Amino acid sequence: MGNKRYTGNWNSVNTHTVPEWYEDCKFGIFIHWGIYSVPAFAPHTWELGEVDSKEWFADNPYAEWYYNSLNIGKGPTYKHHIEKYGKDFKYEDFIPMWKAENWDPKQWAEIFKEAGAEYVVLTTKHHDGFCLFPSKYTHFNSVEMGPKRNITGELTEAVRNAGIRMGLYYSGLIDWQYANDPIFEDDDLFGTASPTFAYADYSYNQMNELVDDYAPSVFWNDIGWPKQSEEMMPYFLSHYYNKVPEGVVNDRFNDRYHDFLTKEYKSGSVNRKEKWEMCRGMGLSFGYNANEGDDKLISVPDLISLLVGTVANNGNLLLNIGPKADGTIPEEQVKRLKILGAWLKVNHDGIYGTRCSDRESEMLENGIELHYTQKEGNLNVFADHLKEGANEFLIKGYHGQLRPFDPSVKVETTDTEEGLLVKIPEYRKELYVVGLTNKL
């Protein structure tokens, strides 16, 4: 893969394959941090994909969409803004308030490492158009305004020094500095919010700038690719793959090409036959939302269940953190990362470097859910939704041995005609999902 050259056409680009590292890594950290982290407000409503888009945008739970929610001119975010800041206070007036005075990129990288993350994806430019990197093409960036720091550069260095791969998010289709008509529904994403020819050139240049300056392992585009420059997409991808031969891109450029599919909360269609990635926030927002206290975030059991179920079905989990404007990660988010990291440390061999098994995930009649992964010919079984105390379940058609990844877990097995009967006589809720393997 390293000696191959891509030549700016679709036939060449289509020869790129998903690198082993992305198949192996399983868990990454998404970061949404920007101007929107100052107001840090959105209503706590529903997950993406749960309701019709018109209803969703009216009460948008994404704090990073504050600009659009304000621009709509009604709804909870608009009301909050008028009451707290006044009708003459513009979104851009938040920029001097974003100081990132307590930001330590090395500390962030240490937290990600402890959490077990194998890659990180930073929002270098979200839909508001504010860039977290110095750019030849705009002064609207975090080096010349706000924090006065190259957030992308500093974090990339810290993350890589921690032995973690660095990826970059870029809002390819939407930039409210170029087209800022309010978005009321999904159709507006590709209609009233469609960019100009000037923006198509701008985004193409900035994408190449990010590739040249940071060589990201993941290029995570969002919403789409400007229709005014569709013919330039294979040139960009060729440039990226020539610069980063083992790089990967998601499915949000257009319908024609991707290395992996994406699912966001309940939105998106994926299957276990093709590599995919689940992304979601700790709560219902990606950007920090001061409305979301500890009780509004995903529980630790649900988080570990999400990771296991995703990995067992050929996915990676890209879990978002939403830092505060001062650069600190909220303690309730850090707490979840640490617990997840501790669980991954114990169950490491059943997650990283695995592939989905021929055995598909199954929900048993007793409410226990079984997930399967395989690695180097070994079978791994994860038992979820166990109850406190004694539990038992049957793995149909399997007649081998199993041992727990966690040596503190007592497991009894009996080979029966139907399969292996597994008993866990003393389950404790702090074990969360119990991992088993036939690797001796």
What are these regions (language model features)?
Residues M1-L440:
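Mature catalytic domains of secreted/periplasmic carbohydrate-active enzymes
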